[in-house]
Amino acid sequence: MRRRYSTSIISLVAAAILFAVTPGVPGSSLPAAAAATDSLPALHIDGSRFVDENGRVVLLHGVNSVNKEPPYFAPETTITAQDAELLSRHGFNTVRLGVNFDGLMPTEGVVDTAYLDRVAAAVDMLAQYGIHTVLDNHQDGLSKIWGGNGFPEWAIHARPAAGEPNPGFPLNYLMPTMNAGWDEVWNNTYGALDYLGQALAALADKMNGHPGALGLELLNEPWPGTAFLSCFPNGCTGFDAKYQAAMQKLTDAVRARNAGLMVLWEPNVTWNETMPSNLGKNPPISAPNIVFAPHDYCIPSQMAIYSGLPTFLRGLCPLQQGKTWGNIDAFTHRTGIPSLVTEFGDGDATVLSNTLINADDRFIGWQYWQYGAGRGADPFLGEIGNQLVRTYPQATSGTPGRMIFDPATGDFAYRYTPRATGKPTEIYVSDLHYPNGYQVRVDGGTVTSAPGARVVTVEANGSTPVSVYINRPGSKGASVPDGPVGTGSASGSASGSASGSGGSGSSSGSGS
């Protein structure tokens, strides 16, 4: 019985971290267009939402750009102005940009200022295209010591034992010596957390005066070390308390150098096996401007892709992903802290759709894994891009309500309760879903943008709810689902067409 349990845990662990090898979307070498903006206002947190300087609620859609190999960021390959133009054209307004402790502090106690300069230049470049950057302190497999990346070798004292098998990523997470290395981190045995705090503080300081820097994610996919078995089957209260203390320590280091920068905390990686997070239970999270950064991966689908298991297992994905989103709901209810899904990805468009529908239901932003550094044609012109490039409200002048988007038809519907901000609601209209143009109808408001504009702007007529409908000419359209945000599937029904409505709230055009 004990051996059977151990084998089950090994399978779960392997599945939980397989997502990190999900095939990425290659970058684009398309020429840059004149899409750059003069400045990008910084965002801040209001309750559980991101808001801009005018008080509009901002929804973030974006991608990851993470280079796991030295030099960890190269301006000519990691992400370029051509990439930024392409992402902006497709409506993405955020990038999760990988940074690496080994790159920040390759020598003990010495920060690489040239590395900071390269990162800051990328943040500024992305900001010129209206893209907010989350800096992701990335790791996979703790350190190069075990064939991974993240912590510099000098920061970890544990070493593989003579004759200890290394099965490679991801099963190397089960190596006793790697778990000993993780224990060093969480116990701060040799000061690894202190040095990481210094490195992240230097990065945060560098971001002063760079409004495109949305926030700093303290550590990607934190592994519990030898405590990992305690996380099954209901989460690990003891480890999460220690982990929360470590996150608070790093947050304090960052805030000492940059008080306004958002700080993103991930749950420990067993989250991806539907284990709930105990962050914020005891003690509560008291630091301001904290963002929860969960990931959403489907274990059955990943096992089908990477372990040769039957593809019908993907049919279980709605159950597993439903549990993950239930855990997000529980965390939000407990803490009131906003969430940003900083990783999700799969070669199966249906699995992606599960994430995107759940995110739309809750008005939660996301960053897809991953937009790679390879060159080629526009990578968003296939089935995956058809899901990711979406019509959605980028800035809402009021309180968001329910919304739906059907990538098969381009039908979009959205309702919000207006509030005076001095700026209009802005809805990005997908540049992929309306080959013959689109139609827009607004109930309770007026379209103020030109026909065919890539961003539809809407002004409320009063204080009553505003409903916006966008669809292809001749489509039956969609209707806004009933109920408040987070109460059901964003699937909608075909009864809210923008066609034939006339009036001051209507507009149509070919798009551009």
Regions found by a protein language model. Give the residues of each.
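Composition-driven, intrinsically disordered low-complexity tracts enriched in small residues
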Residues: 28-35, 476-512
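Short, basic/low-complexity N-terminal boundary segments at the transition from targeting/disordered tails
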Residues: 22-30, 35-40, 381-388
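Active-site mouth of glycoside hydrolases
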Residues: 38-51, 57-60, 64-262, 267-279
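Secretory targeting and sorting signals
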Residues: 2-32
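N-terminal-biased segments
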Residues: 37-44, 67-68, 73, 78-81, ...
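Substrate-binding clefts and catalytic carboxylate motifs of secreted carbohydrate-active enzymes
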Residues: 53-57, 197-199, 214, 223-469
